[in-house]
Amino acid sequence: MIKINISLEESRVKYSDRHDGAVAFMQQLRRDEEDFTGWVNWPSEIPSEWMDGMKRAADDVRSKCDKLIVIGIGGSYLGTAAVLEALGGSKPGCPEILYAGNNMSGYYLADFKEVVENNEVCLCVVSKSGGTMESRLAFSVLKDWMYEKYGREETAKRIVAVTDPVKGILREEANHEGYVTFEIPGNIGGRYSAFTPGIMFPLAVAGVDIETFVNGAKEIASDDAFWQKGLDYALARFALYESGKEIEVIEYYDPSLRLIGEWCKQLYGEREGKEGKGLFPASLTLSTDLHSMGQFLQEGHQIFFETIFNVVNRDKDVTVPESAGPDLAGRSLNDINAMAVKGVMAAHAKANIPMIKIDIEEMDEYTLGQLLYFLMMTAAVTGKLMGIDPFNQPGVEDYKQEIRNLLGQ
């Protein structure tokens, strides 16, 4: 059952002239005719031994620690963090998942070490090459700290490496030290890695049902109706871009979707921001950010359109007590939040702001699998419509090289 629905009535943009080209590209995607498109059919192709291996390793890690530190940056950790936050964190009795290697702040890492000092810890380092600066620094610091805490032999038993199957400095170290390892498939780029071991292994440790997560993606990957929904969203995004919109503001009225927004920013920013093109992805938590950005959204320079992620059903709620006053007492807080969605959209429609609403039926593993796959597909199609390669990110090497120059590398 498809649990992602899209409403384009508010976009008020015609895009039928691009339909045929987008359909042709989607057909190429489904036939895996482009480089780095292994992610398209991957949910149906994941080897059963990989799934079993991740589950066994997750059981082992759970028996050893109460904190699993995921070391990675960008797509190497954001998928894990986004899914876990949306689900409310680790399941009872499972280790808390913490994140390092996503910045180069000495203060952050020093403080991080103090936070976990008295905990039982395992590491999961996610890096295809092992050479990414942020991850390399954090891994070296935390590994040395674990040597002092556990000794070298025991530390090796507490490290899981997700990396290239044959090459790279992390693969060499993992082979030498005897770490448990999982592969990052060579034809899947990091920004499309939501269903690879780098994301799914930490989720398994946290008690997430990774089979159900993958099944959500697997069902819609083979569903023509789903691909049409993705096509509609991609075409609408491109048409709004062509009409002069420069920013897509991703909005959600549930704070648990904050990291889904961050994941989208990385996905869209690196897929589309090339050759002077692309939509700039921003994200807002509403109603919170209405008290800082609401004025701009309503009456500011209209270089943006809005995409609203709306969770229809949540499994927890609060009834407003009598003390709140007769106009609110007895109401469901989730119902009031739903009225806020409608009210804000009505106000923004009067201001002629283009809006796209994506309804997410409920927030569980199955639906999240559908949502992440849906967003990856629309990013690929929109990028292709813009005339850029949606599967590379050459510009990120420029700043990395400048940093290496300053470090004398």
Regions found by a protein language model. Give the residues of each.
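Extended, charge-enriched "interface" segments that sit outside catalytic cores
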Residues: 1-59, 323-327, 343
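Glycine-rich phosphate/diphosphate-binding loops that line cofactor/substrate pockets in enzymes
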Residues: 53-66, 111-121, 236-246, 297-302
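Glycine-rich phosphate-binding loops that contact phosphosugars or nucleotide phosphates
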Residues: 59-225, 405
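Structural beta-sheet core signal
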Residues: 70, 123-125, 161, 250, ...
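Short helix-loop-beta junction
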Residues: 86-96, 145, 267-278, 347-351
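Active-site phosphate/pyrophosphate-binding segments
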Residues: 150-306, 395-409
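Helicase-primase coupling helices
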Residues: 282-364
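Generic C-terminus detector
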Residues: 369-409
